[in-house]
């Protein structure tokens, strides 16, 4: 008896590659908020669907916007 392991969903496509973005601006908080959870954590690649190159750029952009208080580090609970 063969047992099915896990469920593989459809691979998500990097939204930045589709838009042919060369850089990710840290001042565009509306775009960055899509990749941050409500607890303030950055979504991983396997969930967001970004490629490795754009995930690194996204991480630095989120960290920069946190440092100048455009995005919160965490939510007040």
From Swiss-Prot:
Presence of the UniProt keyword Ribonucleoprotein in the record: yes
Pfam families (alphabetical): Ribosomal_S18 (PF01084)
Keywords: Ribonucleoprotein, Ribosomal protein, RNA-binding, rRNA-binding
GO MF annotations, alphabetized: small ribosomal subunit rRNA binding; structural constituent of ribosome
Entry's Gene Ontology cellular component terms: cytosolic small ribosomal subunit
Record's keyword annotation contains Ribonucleoprotein: yes
Top-rank taxon: Bacteria
GO biological process per UniProt: translation
SUPFAM superfamilies noted in UniProt: Ribosomal protein S18
Biological role: Binds as a heterodimer with protein bS6 to the central domain of the 16S rRNA, where it helps stabilize the platform of the 30S subunit.
Oligomer status and interactors: Part of the 30S ribosomal subunit. Forms a tight heterodimer with protein bS6.
Family stated for the protein in its record: Belongs to the bacterial ribosomal protein bS18 family.
Name of protein: Small ribosomal subunit protein bS18
Originating species: Desulforamulus reducens (strain ATCC BAA-1160 / DSM 100696 / MI-1)
This protein's encoding gene: rpsR
